[in-house]
UniProtKB/Swiss-Prot annotation:
GO biological process, one term: permeabilization of host organelle membrane involved in viral entry into host cell
Disulfide partners: C203-C216, C318-C380
Residues covered by region (Spike head): 65-224
High-level lineage: Viruses, Riboviria, Orthornavirae, Duplornaviricota, Resentoviricetes
Record keywords, A-Z: Capsid protein, Coiled coil, Disulfide bond, Hemagglutinin, Host cell membrane, Host cytoplasm, Host cytoskeleton, Host endoplasmic reticulum, Host membrane, Host-virus interaction, Membrane, Outer capsid protein, Viral attachment to host cell, Viral penetration into host cytoplasm, Viral penetration via permeabilization of host membrane, Virion, Virus entry into host cell
Name of protein: Outer capsid protein VP4
Hydrophobic as annotated region, ranges: 389-409
Motif mapping: KID motif: 644-646
Length: 776
């Protein structure tokens, strides 16, 4: 079977231990390094964590505690607390709507027996009976009357040792504090025309927004934090804090500081950013009515423009993040139009534009601080794409629009065909605009966002104007260039090659013939037959095989096998020490990792889906350890890998180890496994879905997790190449015999080839879906 390649890599990965030890011996050296931090260091140590520095944004930050303000009469805005801080007993604050509510608050010192005092309330002398029996706490009392000539009633006393009180107008009410510190809480009085109530404060006060009410309550109960006193307190409009003063010219280079070897340069630049989107439209195999993918791809664009009379050559790379996956299924027939996945960018997405030009600002862009940018917005509208069907009217994806708004700037690196460029990455947030997009002649309409079908709408590029400023640490001699670690550049170049190779591999999926794939999956592929398509010498082939094994040794599959081996060893040793432990239980613990959950069902909080998913993650390892005669997912994975390696024009010895390792981990992520017990089948997927059914009728039966775990230990595990839903669909539409059902359940390659040669659309579609899952 083709999966022999994975078994061989797992079995022989120890062969690279010697070369690893040699590399470790050569690299584990110590040497003394003396660092002279120079005048640009923040401390006595070397400079650390150079980054993009400050980044402007449009957020206005409202202060939590605004003040103090002197006694005054004014109409406070609704939704803001007045935090009053009186120094002595007497009237604290008063307010009225001049119709049906007069509210005043007085403060009484501790240890006051019942007596009558005279207070001036709203300009009138009033006799009020008061008392405060507390020996340590001051007492705030609300005095309320409902008519101009009425008498005052006392409400909402607050006993406080902080001498702080609060009042707020909000939602048709006047809110105050009541109770006793440190457990005081808010209360309220209903009133009409509350928004026109003028408040007169007889002491210093602060303003706190309602969004920070918890902080205000904390102040009431525990007191204010330490505040520096000033001699002159002048209220200032909050809007003045948002004013930013720009004193720099549009385009200039300023020396901020300089020593003999290094200098800090501030670069201010006007820029014109031009970018475009790229996309990939992949058609599925078959009769020509299905599309597998319509996706965004990174797009490079090079152009020139004039800045201050100087011609500038610029390079941009546009990419997207946070895409939304949509699909359309017109029906189950092979001639029904369908799109497996098409990407749309919306308000939860981001667009990244990496910008570089040939000016001095980008020559030494390695150590940068105080990076800021200010850019305009731009509208991007979608065009039309015709889905060319063999017969019938063509569906058309048309419309869609988003606007891009600047959301920040950071440093980045662009990769061209010849060189890597240190550049600026401008991040744009999106908002959806009119018109929505639709697929004409389908039920898809009125959706918002920009689909990947034709994002440029015939435009050569989109354009944004703006400016940026940064301070860069550069050599004092302009002829020198800041050194960059070569190893980083090499690794980044390898990542670029791997990215291109992954794209090529994914695009080759639709070109694989299924009948040839099944034949190839049955061949016993070893390492050298797998890599025979790569042009290289024998010595290079040996080195390449070693590199593949070295990389594969660190894969998640190899790590899982190692962990499983340790678990089985522990289970065996435990069984030897204690004869009362069942061997089946020990095996379950090693293979499924859920025996403890099954021991005490009442204490288990896991759902059946969680338990079956836990077991399913180990079933691939059980299948590798106990190979059956049927075809498995790794056979298909290895066959697809071999086919793509032979057809690839970009594969090389440097990229092969990463590709083989990724294929073992990422090909066919949605796997399902089954065990057969007489006429009953238990099937569980790695996504938590599970089925139990009878072979005779394909009728579902209750799923017993305990029994499934026991069968996993004692019975062979089989890859569900043809899963339960496909089998049931096949039986309902075509009818299959009992023998055919058992052969499909066992993934018999002979029966699979029969159905494929008969051009059975259900089986072909299932195999097509497995091939399309072989993506990197």
């Amino acid at each position: 079977m083709a999966s022999l390649i994975y078994r061989q890599l797992l079995a022989n990965s120890y062969a690279v231990d010697l070369s690893d030890e040699i590399d470790i011996i050569g690299s584990e050296k110590t040497q003394n390094v003396t660092i002279n931090p120079g005048p640009f260091a923040q401390t006595g140590y070397a400079p650390v964590n150079w980054g993009p520095g400050e980044t402007n944004d449009s957020t206005t930050i409202e202060p939590i505690l605004d003040g103090p303000y002197p006694p005054t009469t004014f109409n406070p805005p609704t939704g803001y607390w007045m935090l009053l801080s009186p120094l002595e007993a007497g009237v604290v604050v008063e307010g009225t709507n001049n119709s049906d509510r007069w509210l005043a608050t007085i403060l009484i010192e501790p240890n006051v027996a019942a007596e009558t005092r005279t207070y001036t309330l709203f300009g009138v002398q009033e006799q009020i009976s008061i008392s405060n029996t507390s020996s340590t706490k001051w007492k705030f009392v609300d005095l309320v009357k409902t008519s101009l000539t009425g008498t005052y009633s006392q409400y909402g006393p607050l006993l406080s040792d902080t001498k702080l009180y609060g009042a707020m107008k909000y939602s048709g009410r006047i809110y105050t504090y009541e109770g006793e510190t440190p457990n005081a809480a808010t209360g309220y009085y209903s009133t009409t025309n509350y928004d026109s109530v003028n408040m007169t404060a007889f002491c210093d006060f602060y303003i706190i927004p309602r969004s920070q009410e918890s902080t205000c309550t904390n102040y009431i109960n525990n007191g204010l934090p330490p505040i520096q006193n000033t001699r002159n307190v002048v209220p200032v409009s909050l809007a003045s804090r948002a004013i930013i003063s720009h004193r720099a010219q549009a385009n200039e280079d300023i020396i901020v500081s300089q020593t003999s070897l290094w200098k800090e340069m501030q670069y201010n630049r006007d820029i014109t950013i031009r970018f475009k989107f790229a996309n990939a439209i992949v058609k599925s195999g078959g009769l020509g009515y299905k599309w597998s993918e319509i996706s965004f791809k990174p797009a490079n664009y090079q152009y020139t423009y004039v800045r201050d009379g100087e011609e500038v050559t610029a390079h941009t790379t546009c990419s997207v993040n946070g895409i939304n996956d949509f699909s359309y299924n017109g029906g189950s027939l092979p001639t029904d139009f369908g799109i497996s996945r098409y990407e749309v960018i919306k308000e939860n997405s981001y667009v990244y534009v990496d910008y570089w030009d040939d000016s001095q600002a980008f020559r030494n862009m390695v150590y940068v601080r105080s990076l800021a940018a200010d850019l305009n917005s731009v509208m991007c509208t979608g065009g039309s794409y015709n889905f060319a069907l063999p017969v019938g009217q063509w569906p058309v994806m048309t419309g869609g629009a988003v606007s891009l708004h600047s959301a920040g700037v950071t440093l980045s690196t662009q990769f061209t065909d010849f060189v890597s460029l240190n550049s600026l990455r401008f991040r744009f947030r999106l908002s959806v605009e009119e018109p929505p997009f639709s697929i004409v002649r389908t039920r898809i309409s009125g959706l918002y966002g920009l689909p990947a079908a034709d994002p440029n709408n015939g435009n050569e590029y989109y354009e944004i104007a703006g400016r940026f400023s940064l301070i860069s640490l550069v050599p004092s001699n302009d002829d020198y260039q800041t050194p960059i670690m070569n190893s980083v550049t090499v690794r980044q170049d390898l990542e670029r090659q791997l990215g291109e190779l992954r794209e090529e591999f994914n695009a080759l999926s639709q070109e694989i013939a299924m009948s040839q794939l099944v034949d190839l999956a049955l061949l016993p592929l070893d390492m050298f037959s797998m890599f025979s398509g790569i042009k290289s010498t024998i010595d290079a082939a040996k080195s390449m095989a070693t590199n593949v094994m070295k990389k594969f040794k660190k894969s998640s599959l190899a790590s899982s096998v190692s962990t499983l081996t340790d678990s089985l060893s522990d289970a065996a040793s435990s069984m030897t020490r204690n004869s009362s432990i069942r061997s089946v239980g020990s095996s379950i613990s090693a293979w499924t990792d859920v025996s403890s959950q099954l021991t005490d069902a009442s204490a288990s909080t896991s759902t059946i889906a969680t338990q079956t998913a836990t077991i399913s993650r180990r079933l691939r390892l059980k299948e590798i350890a106990t190979q059956t005669e049927g075809m498995n997912f790794d056979d298909i994975s290895a066959a697809v890998l071999k086919t793509k390696i032979d057809r690839s024009v970009q594969i090389s010895p440097s990229t092969l180890p990463d590709i083989v390792t990724e294929a073992s981990e990422k090909f066919i992520p949605n796997r399902a496994y089954r065990v057969i017990n007489n006429d009953e089948v238990f099937e569980a997927g790695m996504d938590g879905r599970f089925f139990a059914y009878r072979v005779e009728t394909f009728e579902e039966i209750p799923f017993d997790v305990q029994r499934f775990a026991d069968l996993v230990t004692d019975s062979p595990v089989i890859s569900a190449i043809i899963d339960f839903k496909t089998l049931k669909n096949l039986n309902d539409n075509y009818g299959i015999t009992r023998d055919q059902a058992f052969n499909l359940l066992r993934s018999d390659p002979r029966v699979l080839r029969e159905f494929i040669n008969q051009d059975n659309p259900i089986i072909r579609n299932r195999i097509e879906q497995l091939i399309l899952q072989c993506r990197l």
